[in-house]
Structures are given as structure tokens and as C-alpha cells.
Amino acid sequence: FNIVNDKIHLTISRFFGPSLGKVNIPDSLIIKLNNYIDEIIAKDTNEAQLNDYGPNLAGQVKQEIKLPKHIVEGELLDYLISISKLYVKLSTTQEITKFELMSTWIVRQFENEYNPAHVHGGHLSGAGYLKLPNSFGKTIQEKKKNIHGNINFIHGTEQFLSKGAISEKPCVGDFYIFPHYLFHSVNPFIG
């Protein structure tokens, strides 16, 4: 179902046990986060290396950059709190009384890199898209659906009236929110 709050349009889907929320990241946040990453990469300093969060994560990617406190505080934190509260209320009818952000990072995924199936700590997780390549590449089998670069959500096994997994083609601005225990992965892309 779809819920429109003052500023948030949240879609909740139940493809399997846990609910999956999807919202759009405000353009102002996309610009702020992209500018921050572009600046530290362009400076050619060791800031990107100092903030390298890759060793703590499941991904097989070269650049996973932890966001510093000054970038998270303010608009980004307020946004994450708002969507978390709305997601929990709509999924469970419960109210969040305490919110603690454990960590945030940006994954810069390039050709042939991927994130294997994994879960996170805490209670809720999220994944958003700030930039995407012009092309995810062609499939080897032309008649098959192109899932290059897709994000996958996996829960249980496929059975009557229940999918075991879904695969979503990302768009810039998509943000998914889900329980921390929901396995998710990101496919590699070509080109």
C-alpha cells in the first residue's frame, strides 16, 4: 500500500514475511551526498581511504566510504528518522520511541563488482541510490530479463503464494527500508 505523509511517499510491499518499504530520496539529499563523495574523490587526498568502510562490509567493491558525522547530522538524519518511524508504524502499528543510527556509508560500485547476500546489525536497514551507470550491460541470453545491477531481497523459500526472493532494477532516488535480518544482495553489472 501507498502512504503519503507531509513530505514522504512510502510504499510498503509484502512479497514474503517481512515488509519492504520504498521511498524517494529528496533531490537536496542526493545532491549533498553526491557532492561530498565527488569532492573527496576529486581532492585525491586520503580522506576516502581514511573513511574506507569496506573491510567491515560484505561487498566485493573497491570504494565503500563511511559518512562522517557532519554529513549525517541534519537533513539526512532527520530523513532517516522520519522514514523509519513511518515504516515501523505502517508495518507493525507500533511507534518508535528511540532512534539510534549505527552507521551510514556509500558504496561506489563499478563494473563487475557486487555485494553478496548479507544482513546488517541493528533493527532496520536501508539501501539507496544516488547515481547509476548509463548502462548495466547486455544479457548473454537476449530473451531473459536483464538483472545486471539489480538489488535482491531474499527471505525463506519460494512456495505457494509466497516468493522467496524479489529483484528490483534501481533508479536514482530509490531508497529501500527493511528489517535488518532481511538478506539482500546487489548484482554486478557490465559496462
Predicted feature locations:
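Short, charged beta-turn/beta-strand-edge "cap" motif at the junction between a beta-strand
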Residues: 182-185
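Catalytic core of non-heme Fe(II) oxygenases with the double-stranded beta-helix
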Residues: 102-177, 187
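A general secondary-structure signal for short beta-strands and their flanking turns/coil
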Residues: 16-18, 99, 121-123
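Non-heme Fe(II)/2-oxoglutarate
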Residues: 1-94, 105, 112-115
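Short, intrinsically disordered, charge-balanced linker/junction segments flanking boundaries
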Residues: 190-191
